[in-house]
Structures are given as C-alpha cells and as structure tokens.
Amino acid sequence: PMQIAREILTGTRLDLISAYFSPPFAMLRRIARMGRRGRVRIITAARSDNNATIAAARHTYARLLRNGVEMYEYRPQKLHTKLVIVDDVVHIGSSNFDFRSLYLNLEVMLRIEDRAFAEQMRGYFERELADSLQITPDLHRQRASWWRRLKWTLSYFLVTTVDYTVTRRLSFGPEG
C-alpha cells in the first residue's frame, strides 16, 4: 500500500477498480489532490454481499467529486476486480482499497511498470466503465438524503474503525 500511496502522491492519472473502497483519510486526501492536478477515475461496486461496504464507499464520494474525481458504480454483477493504474504503473492482485485489505489481510499486489501493459489495462478499465453508472455530483446529491448520509457515515465508521479494531484484536490479541 505504501508504494501505491507514493505513486498517487506524485502521479497525474489514476484508474482504480475496487469492490470495497473505504480507504483511510490520508489516502482520500492524496486521491483528492490527484483529482485536482490530473485525472482520477474510480469504479466501485453497486452490488455486494455486504451493503455496509457500498454505503462506506458512498461516504467518500462527496469529497472526491468536489475535487474532480470521476466516480462510477459497476452494475451488472458483483465486482471482484482489484486494479490500480497510476500513470504507467499497474498494480493488480487481491487487495481491495479498504482498511482490512491495506492493513490486516495478507494480500498480494503485483506491480508492473510498463507503458504498453498500462494501456492494455486501461482498455480493460474502459470496458468495465461502459458497464458502470457515473455518479455525478447531481446524482450523488439526489441520493444523499440526511438518512442515507447518516447510514453512509456509520458504515464508513463500521468498516474502517470497528471492523478493523475487532479483527486486529481477534487476530493479534489486545497488544497487537
């Protein structure tokens, strides 16, 4: 995760697909900054076996949209792809863009620095984008009733803090 964070800090183009998207605030800040200086497109899940993860992702949309990030939700079926393309570098593997994947689970992401491969993977990204609904600022505002915003905020707290803390303690003990 630190390599991806460094690349996002200095990069100008990010295409990201992740079913679970609830990164820490520091990563959200980096993505928002990149949205102001370059092009950022993120595809998250519209469907999941865990609705809290969708709500947690939606909690991040307003800030990212305000900073020029393009947000999409993949609609045809459950999303399982984990893909990050920063400029000419591709990261592909098992890690979602959430606390559990970034800090708890044993995940593998293959880093490939190759312009031609990055373009091939952007072709794949474009095909997934065609099956995704763009979440515009207007659409997000229409969806964001006070009740939904509350659910999104609580879900973000649940998946970034409660789930992380409980899982960490169960896995590593109280001192872990």
Residue locations for each model-derived region?
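Secondary-structure "cap/kink" motif recognition
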Residues: I4-R13
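PLD/PLD-like phosphodiesterase catalytic module centered on the HKD motif
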Residues: R13-L16, Y20-G176
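Leucine-rich repeat
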Residues: M2-Q3, L28
